[in-house]
Amino acid sequence: MNKFAIIHMQKFQISDVQGIQKHNQRQGKSKSNLDIDYSKSEQNYDLLNQQKIRYESTIKQEISERVKRKPRANSVVLSEFVVTASPDYMHSLSLEEQKRYFESSLDFIQKRYGKQNTLYAMVHMDEATPHMHIGVMPITEDNRLSAKDMFTRKELISLQQDFPLEMREKGFDVDRGEGSEKKHLSPQAFKEKQDLEVEVEQLSNVKTHLKTKVVETHNQLQQTTNYIEKQNETLQKIQQQFLSLDKKIKEKKQEFETFRNQIPDKPVSMSYLREETKTEVTTKLFGKPEITEKKTGNIVVTREQWRDMTEKVNAAVIVKKDYERLQKTDLVKENQSLREDNKYLEETIKGNNLALKHSYKQNRELEEVNKELHTEIGTLKAHIRDLQMNIKVLYQQTKKVFKEQFKAFRGLIKNELDMKGVDNQFEREHTREIRSRQKGYDMER
């Protein structure tokens, strides 16, 4: 189990103070720090303040009362120390021992940088590893606001050496963190890289979701298109039936018109040649027989009159039969029903076409969003590559400047990156250089 005492410091300007207060006092929920368990935030406590203080107004008041000269707008007004230990060791301590660890750390800071300069000592119990934020104003003994003079490079190196020794004297079994292979929380460049990697992952998830959505929308479009095609086929069949029936109706109208022309509009008397008579001869006893003409009730017609009469009767018979058939099959009603079906299908297809048009528009919009996300992901990846290159350059330049002190400086960087898991790119550059040097050496051999 690692047992490293961890302390690192970061400087802030007045414009940063409000954000520091919000984080320390859990004012609102952080979207970037996923390690915070807000159900445990009630367990957090401040060793110096019973009530929450306002960082900015407190700092301004201290500067007004204690600092001789008015500071510049970009002056460092707050130096915040983060104090903890290796996660395994920290969790092995009881709550009482954890509190004593933080109280001892606070006592160490106050003795070193002044009790009057110490504004807060906020202990966070709601993250992965318990730790404490100690806010110190960099006011010197001669009442100057100068983080540069108070926290020199020599002082920071000494701090990393003295803090573990102090904690051991207080009864804690801890060592200096130099040489640790742990992965740590980065300062500004590393934190930005971590945030960008998280954002890239989130955008990749969104991109995957949008791809799925595009496929689903495409399938819906295909189904809608197939449905509309079937509806169009049905409509065409009904239209053909409608045209066929309309043609039959027109033909029947023509037949009716022909028969109507053959049938008089008004009752007519049939012409005939004469009435048929029968001659009766009555014999008498005396005289001539009596001859009489009696009507039989029949009529005598010519052949032409008979032909005309037959045609009219036949036409009437045909009209009667068609009329009786129409009583059973109402072509008018059938035609009206087909018209209504045709209208309904036309309205349905019109609505489906509108839905299809909307789906095509939605699909194009999703493709545009997907394209934009792809571009943004590429930009973020390029930004990450730039950060990695900057770290590489920083490593090389730092090595040139510090030379003999480089090992101590590298140890300082490691300790300053000791809160949450993130790749230590600075150390990676060192390891890569060692391996490259070893590889060249092996090739020479």
Swiss-Prot record:
UniProt keyword list: DNA-binding, Plasmid
Name of the protein this chain belongs to: Plasmid recombination enzyme
Annotated organism of origin: Bacillus thuringiensis
Keyword DNA-binding listed: yes
Statement: the UniProt record of this protein carries the keyword DNA-binding: yes
Source taxonomy: Bacteria, Bacillati, Bacillota, Bacilli, Bacillales
Transmembrane segments: none
GO BP: DNA recombination
GO molecular function, one term: DNA binding
Classification via InterPro entries: Mob_Pre
